[in-house]
């Protein structure tokens, strides 16, 4: 079984020293969902929200969140991200919005937390913008879809999950 990397021999939380690691291209993708009533989704898709373009605002929020993950999650390293991409797609057949984030860099540590934070904050932004018309929207699940680069190897969610 793998060991927790943020816990030292004394059982204390600490920031992992990555100074000896080689720089490699690292990438991670994550997804989040916001489920809502069909009327709320139609309002977003039709561009009829009085606050403006919900998808554009959520996209910017997700990008900003990825860039600031190190300020939000204790023990995360500040990273020089080379790419953050947020895709939002209405899924009317499920009354939800699917958010997928992609983060990439050339560096010494992975970008999984940045991808997860980006997708999560984009989802929270959709909730924030639409809560006046629907308070019982549901956020989730949020999950890592894939990661590549680094010594722990690649990871990809099973296509059937």
UniProtKB/Swiss-Prot annotation:
Keywords: Lyase, Molybdenum cofactor biosynthesis. GO terms for molecular function: cyclic pyranopterin monophosphate synthase activity. Pathway: Cofactor biosynthesis; molybdopterin biosynthesis. Substrate binds at residues 75-77, 113-114. It is an enzyme of class 4 (lyase). It catalyses: (8S)-3',8-cyclo-7,8-dihydroguanosine 5'-triphosphate = cyclic pyranopterin phosphate + diphosphate. Its EC number is 4.6.1.17. The active site is at residue 128. One of its GO terms (biological process) is Mo-molybdopterin cofactor biosynthetic process. Pfam families: MoaC (PF01967). Catalyzes the conversion of (8S)-3',8-cyclo-7,8-dihydroguanosine 5'-triphosphate to cyclic pyranopterin monophosphate (cPMP). Belongs to the MoaC family. PANTHER family: MOLYBDOPTERIN COFACTOR SYNTHESIS PROTEIN A. Homohexamer; trimer of dimers. This is Cyclic pyranopterin monophosphate synthase.
């Amino acid at each position: 079984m793998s060991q927790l990397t943020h816990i030292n021999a004394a059982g204390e939380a600490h920031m992992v020293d990555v100074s000896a690691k080689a720089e490699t291209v690292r990438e991670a993708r994550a997804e989040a969902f916001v489920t809502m009533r069909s009327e709320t989704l139609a309002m977003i898709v039709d561009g009829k929200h009085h606050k403006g373009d919900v998808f554009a605002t959520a996209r910017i929020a997700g990008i900003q969140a990825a860039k600031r993950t190190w300020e939000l999650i204790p023990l995360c390293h500040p990273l020089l991200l080379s790419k953050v991409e947020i895709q939002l797609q209405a899924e009317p057949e499920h009354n939800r919005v699917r958010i997928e984030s992609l983060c990439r860099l050339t560096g010494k540590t992975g970008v999984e937390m940045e991808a997860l934070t980006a997708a999560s904050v984009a989802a929270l932004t959709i909730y924030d913008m639409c809560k006046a018309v629907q308070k019982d929207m549901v956020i989730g699940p949020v999950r890592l879809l894939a990661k590549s680069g680094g010594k722990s190897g690649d990871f990809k969610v099973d296509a059937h999950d």
